[in-house]
A protein has these predicted regions:
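Class II aminoacyl-tRNA synthetase catalytic cores and aaRS-like
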Residues: 1-598
Length: 598
């Protein structure tokens, strides 16, 4: 029978009790972690978000009624205990903040009983994630998840305080906006008042924050809720939180400088890690050439090397045909891995095929200087020697090579170096390597659409020196865009925005936007630009990703209170779900079942 807590007031949280409280009578409330009856003495671990304290029940101290209730305690009962804080009678528990003290109970109230939970409420649970997400309210009682959520809260508070001190205004932007379908799919919200018309949930506050700069707000930020209807993976959710900011009368350097100071503060206070500033910078081109990725993991080397010139005259058909078709031959050096078993090498070859490789050539350098090579019979000894030299190979090394179009080679080797690093345990979660990647291509060509599309968005400023190329070689135009990367994860990105009419018109033209289409989608922004727009730039971080890396989690699901799973559903609330037909009728919406194609 649940009891009332009337007349009781909690003194503090369980693990906030210290040796300074010894001798004091206190009232603690929380959940029973476990309870053990040792014959006349009951030891109960009481838990809340701060941690655990041990409670001692003896009938001589708490009376027959409270002792009888203590005998009934089970995991996850919610209780209130009044008692005196004492030094531990037995050995201290070094695993608890309260390991040197305990509470001797005087009275007990059972505020709420609990059924047997579907899984143990414990640190580092081995329970399947789907079951934990179905009972997320129980999962969130686990200490590791509670720590993650508390750190997330601290990060959000610190971001707000830092940006406010820097002169930023926190301004909320609408979440019911106009659909401007560029990039990911929008989540659409039907309007009852305007039948047949729809709002979109924002993929980001991009246009609205630019309008705030037009409004003279100078510096804006918010922790913005964003929505993207896209396929999920470990670092994606259909709804997520963005640390969003925009600044007026600035250029690239101003944005990078203020954000370096923000990152330095966050990682020092949360992780006790000193971010070295200025943060290393690398152009997009250099990142691709050296690491095969625009978000390279800098915690280890194993850089790509272009050996096209070294093998251009060889007769190995794989290398030869790739070069004849305008591709390249590149390699990575797995230092000291010449003894890797053939089974592991074969597994890496199959892994590479998953990223478009037709195969993977390899060469092991034995300690005596001889080679074990998958393509040795197709190349002369001096060609192999030159290849090894170009790769800085030495006895004990294992070299891998990919030959194809640059895009495929980068994808294959960029991912292969990460997989090898994972297998060699080179990726230390507490080693934070930051990087700014700059000078992204402004545009990329979409074979599917048969036109150039914006790599970031249509309002990104080209680099001034590349403007003459926009008509003759659009793919070569670089953007004033930048991403902040940490340990191979893109934390966020931003750019300087276009504020000149002629450049914006040219951008729409290159993107194959007619004036009519541009006005239909972005007329409100183009109108605002007629009335004096300041040069402006901004950046947005994924808050979820930042916290994920800070706490060493494997997925952003571990730092979000109520996340979705890979099909964008919520297992706990069973959303999405059908709605009452009357609701659809009010919205003038009819559900049409898709017929299977014959």
């Amino acid at each position: 029978m649940a009891e009332s807590m009337a007349g009781l007031k909690r003194s503090c949280r369980c693990a906030e009790v210290t040796e300074a409280n010894v001798g004091q009578e206190m009232t603690l409330m929380g959940w029973v972690q476990k309870s053990r009856n040792k014959g006349g003495i009951i030891f109960t671990d009481l838990r809340d978000r701060s941690g655990i304290i041990q409670i001692i029940f003896e009938e001589s101290d708490c009376g027959a009624e409270s002792f009888a209730k203590a005998e009934k305690l089970r995991s996850e009962f919610t209780v209130a205990v009044v008692g005196t804080i004492e030094k531990r009678s037995g050995a201290a528990n070094p695993n608890l903040k309260t390991g040197t003290i305990e509470m001797r109970a005087k009275s007990l109230r059972i505020l709420s009983e609990s059924e047997v939970p579907p899984f143990p409420i414990e640190e580092n649970s081995k329970t399947k994630e789907d079951l934990r997400l179905k009972y997320r309210y129980l999962d969130l009682r686990r200490p590791d998840l509670q720590r993650n959520i508390m750190i997330r809260s601290r990060v959000a508070t610190m971001v707000r305080q830092f940006l406010a001190d820097e002169g930023f205004l926190e301004i909320e932007t609408p979440t019911l906006i106009k659909s401007t379908p560029e990039g990911a799919r929008d989540y659409l919200v039907p309007s009852r008042v305007h039948p047949g018309e729809f709002y979109a949930l924002p993929q980001s506050p991009q246009l609205l924050k630019q309008l705030l700069m037009c409004s003279g707000m100078d510096r804006y930020f918010q922790l913005a809720r964003c929505y993207r209807d896209e396929d999920l993976r470990a670092d994606r959710q259909p709804e997520f939180t963005q640390i969003d900011m925009e600044l007026s009368f600035v250029d690239v350097e101003d944005v990078l400088e203020v954000n370096e100071r923000l990152l330095k503060k966050l990682f020092k206070e949360i992780c006790n890690f000193d971010v070295q500033t200025p943060i290393l910078r690398m152009t997009w081109r250099e990142a691709m050439d050296r690491f095969g990725s625009d978000k390279p993991d800098m915690r280890f080397g194993m850089e790509l090397k272009n050996v096209s010139d070294v093998v251009k005259d060889c007769e190995f058909v794989v290398f030869k045909s790739a070069l004849e078709n305008g591709g390249s031959v590149r390699g990575i050096n797995a230092d000291g891995q010449a003894g890797m078993p053939r089974k592991k090498i074969d597994a890496l070859v199959e892994y590479a095929k998953g990223f478009g490789a037709k195969g993977l050539a390899y060469l092991a350098i034995h300690e005596d200087g001889s080679y074990k090579c998958s393509f040795g019979k197709f190349m002369k000894q001096e060609e192999l020697d030159a290849l090894v030299k170009a790769m800085d190979g030495k006895p004990g090394d294992l070299l891998f090579f990919a030959a194809d179009k640059d895009k495929v080679v980068f994808d294959v080797l960029g991912n292969l170096r990460l997989e090898i690093a994972r297998q060699l345990d080179l990726l230390k979660k507490d080693d934070f390597k930051f990087l700014w990647v700059t000078e992204f291509p402004l545009l990329e060509y979409s074979e599917e659409e048969g036109r150039y599309v914006a790599m970031h968005h249509p309002f990104t400023m080209p680099m001034e020196e590349d403007l003459p190329l926009i008509d003759t070689d659009p793919g070569a135009v670089r953007a004033k865009a930048y991403d902040i990367v940490l340990n191979g994860t893109e934390l966020g990105g931003g750019s300087v925005r276009i504020h000149q009419d002629d450049i914006q018109e040219k951008m729409f033209e290159v993107l194959d936007f007619t004036k009519e289409r541009a006005r239909e989608q972005f007329g409100f922004l183009l109108d605002a630009f007629k009335y004096g727009v300041p040069p402006h730039a901004g950046l947005a971080y994924g808050l979820d990703r930042v916290v994920m890396l800070m706490v060493g989690a494997d997925s952003i699901r571990d730092v979000i209170a109520f996340p979705k799973v890979k099909d964008a559903s919520c297992l706990m609330m069973e959303a999405p779900a059908p709605v009452d037909p009357k609701q659809l009728e009010d919205l003038d919406i009819a559900i049409v079942e898709k017929k299977d194609e014959e």
